[in-house]
Amino acid sequence: MLEVQGISKKWKDFHLKDISFSVMDGEYFIVLGPSGAGKTVLLEIIAGIIPPDGGKVLLDGKDITLLPPEKRGIAYVPQNYALFPNMSVFDNIAFGLKVRRVPRSEIEKRVLEISEVLGIRHLLHRKPRTLSGGEQQRVAVARALVIEPEIILLDEPFANLDVQIRSRLINEMKRWRRELGFTAIHVTHSFEEALALGDRVGIMLNGKLVQVGEIREVFSRPNSEEVAKFLGFENIIEGIADGRVLHVGKLRIELPLEAKGRVRIGIRPEDILISTERIKTSARNVFKAKVEAIEDVGPLVKLTLNVCDITLRAFITRSSLVELGIEEGKEVYASFKASAIHVF
């Protein structure tokens, strides 16, 4: 088990603040946050590349805070993969084993085994410059795993890949983990990677680890408005709660639980259903709305709605936009279930 206890670090204009969490053996732990949150600095401290100003890193109960990287039993895959350009793929993968003075026959056996699992055995004679981004990523992961580390650290491993390759390698990473059973800390800004790969997640914002928990629990129940906004709860509404009803001006919103006094709620845009007529639905919150803006957001369309002078944002598909004849100024109905609401 890896334990990070109260790690702090001032780095240029950045401050990592009292970071604590643990990773169990066999766990895939995601550190999720925006660019500049301090994710890479945290990984480099765990890897031993830079020292912390305070706090400890323990591996299986042993304090490794001041140990050099090569004595930690930890493998680190940086974002740029850091492959040796003058070496073949075989020699890149074998590098850590050679440093550890593993016998040549054992090196060859382990390199062939890991390259078979990762699907790169046919590339062993090649140089890194002749490889695609996805192939380089596989080589970097193979080089890390072949030394059989206690834990592997992955810094935005899919960030430099195009969408199709990234999606394929995420699925392959699941398979590699099943077959090899490794423990990992994976830092990313991608919700897709977090949801697809993680057992637990730590949300990192402005140098602080602000929430840690099971992936689905954190995504559905953020512990603060700050976390909710980062996780896509674009609709944050403040009002006065009286039992299971929130009063927001003329609006009455049914809540999923009893509350009293001034509270805030969060609703994801994808949880709001749009229709041009009032429809039969189990949703207890159905409101007439006016479309104020229409914005393309990749495969979806975001609608900005005015509901009794309250702004709501909702997603619909392009085909639904056309089929419903929705345009700016049109009146529609917006509905959402009480269970889709998160109360802060």
From Swiss-Prot:
Q: Give the main localization category.
A: membrane
Kinase as UniProt keyword: no
Residue limits of the ABC transporter domain? 2-231
Entry keywords, A to Z: ATP-binding, Cell membrane, Membrane, Molybdenum, Nucleotide-binding, Translocase, Transport
The membrane spanning regions, by residue number, are: none
Q: Which residues form the Mop domain?
A: 280-344
| An individual GO BP term | molybdate ion transport
**PROSITE patterns in alphabetical order:** ABC_TRANSPORTER_1 (PS00211), ABC_TRANSPORTER_2 (PS50893), MOP (PS51866)
Q: Which residues does the annotation say bind ATP? A: G33, P34, S35, G36, A37, G38, K39, T40
Q: Does the keyword Nucleotide-binding apply?
A: yes
What assembly does the database describe for this protein? The complex is composed of two ATP-binding proteins (WtpC), two transmembrane proteins (WtpB) and a solute-binding protein (WtpA).
**Name of the featured protein:** Molybdate/tungstate import ATP-binding protein WtpC
Q: What is the organism field in this record? A: Pyrococcus furiosus (strain ATCC 43587 / DSM 3638 / JCM 8422 / Vc1)
